[in-house]
Design a protein with these regions (language model features):
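Hydrophobic transmembrane alpha-helices of multi-pass small-molecule transport proteins
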Residues: 99-116, 239-258
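Cytoplasmic-side transmembrane-helix entry/capping segments in multi-pass membrane proteins
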Residues: 41-51, 96-108, 125-130, 149-161, ...
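Helix-helix packing/entry segments at the starts of transmembrane helices
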Residues: 73-79, 146-161, 198-230
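C-terminal transmembrane-helix exit sites in multi-pass transporters
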Residues: 61-63, 80-102, 222-241
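Transmembrane alpha-helical segments that form core, pore/gating elements
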Residues: 2-3, 10-11, 25, 120-179, ...
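Juxtamembrane helix-entry segments on the extracytoplasmic side of multipass membrane proteins
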Residues: 7, 15, 39-43, 111, ...
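Hydrophobic/small/kink-forming positions within alpha-helical transmembrane segments
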Residues: 26, 51-59, 81-86, 111, ...
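Membrane-interface interhelical linkers
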Residues: 22-49, 150, 161-189, 199-209, ...
Length: 265
């Protein structure tokens, strides 16, 4: 998407990516007959919350991605497992001990190191990236709260449809940019990746152990560092690497403590 933003409008790119993602999701949803099911008010409310959170996440994360180095955005996003732990304690009544609270505070210190508020290296879009983490947390918690009988494909389709409609409305009054073959290839790649990631992410959050699933998020930081250097010549500085290390270390420690507590029950 970062490459795509160099050629076409922000919301046009989001619209086309979501539009390409819709047909395969619709086919899967129709085959599973998941769109004909009736859902409880609770599940309808959670799905709506998830759609709104996903729209907000898409806009904030991709805005930060457009204007910030790839590694910086990804490093800030690594605070998500810590944010989920904090949200679970505050809103779901999950018991979090002082060690995990300490890990959360240290992890967000790493975020502040990357953001560098008030310093010369401060980028205001870092705050936009941080907002995406908050919205991602809302999305993940709402996903986790959905009843197990709600089909994953229905959640994925409704979310993608919501983003498509939102992006289409955002394009009203703007000039449509001609899309060349290279951009179409990027759109197809992005749509394929986000479709698979959406489905797997929903399944993982609903059926997997969060302490097992969350560490896999940290592997994206390695990929982001490599892609940033390869495609954009973005070499992360020492401060960014330090902040990223603190976030990842704190996240693993928090998940380690969660595993110990789960094993003792």
């Amino acid at each position: 998407m970062k490459l795509l933003f160099l050629d076409i409008d922000f919301f046009q790119a989001i619209f086309l990516r979501s539009l390409v993602s819709l047909p395969p999701l619709l086919i899967l949803a129709l085959r599973a007959k998941s769109l004909l099911q009736k859902y409880s008010k609770k599940n309808k409310r959670l799905i709506i919350i998830r759609i709104l959170a996903e729209i907000g996440t898409t806009v904030t994360f991709l805005t930060a991605l457009k204007y910030m180095p790839l590694a910086n955005v990804t490093a800030i996003a690594q605070s998500l497992p810590l944010a989920i732990t904090m949200a679970a304690a505050l809103f779901l009544g999950e018991r979090v001990g002082w060690r995990r609270w300490s890990a959360i505070l240290i992890g967000f210190t790493g975020v502040l190191i990357i953001i560098r508020p008030g310093l010369a290296g401060f980028n205001s879009y870092s705050l936009v990236a941080l907002a995406s983490v908050i919205l991602l947390t809302i999305r993940e918690i709402s996903t986790r709260k959905l009843d197990s009988e709600i089909p994953t494909i229905a959640v994925a389709f409704s979310t993608t449809l919501g983003i498509t409609v939102f992006a289409a409305l955002s394009l009203i009054g703007s000039e449509w940019v001609e899309v060349h073959i290279t951009s179409w290839l990027l759109i197809i790649v992005a749509a394929s990746a986000v479709t698979v990631a959406t489905l797997l992410g929903i399944v993982a959050m609903r059926t997997g152990d969060i302490s097992f699933v969350s560490p896999f998020r940290y592997t994206s930081l390695i990929g982001a560092l490599g892609l940033g250097v390869l495609f954009f010549g973005e070499w992360p500085d020492g401060v960014t690497l330090l902040g990223a290390f603190i976030i990842v270390f704190s996240g693993f420690y928090s998940l380690h403590r969660e595993h110990i507590l789960s094993a003792s029950k």
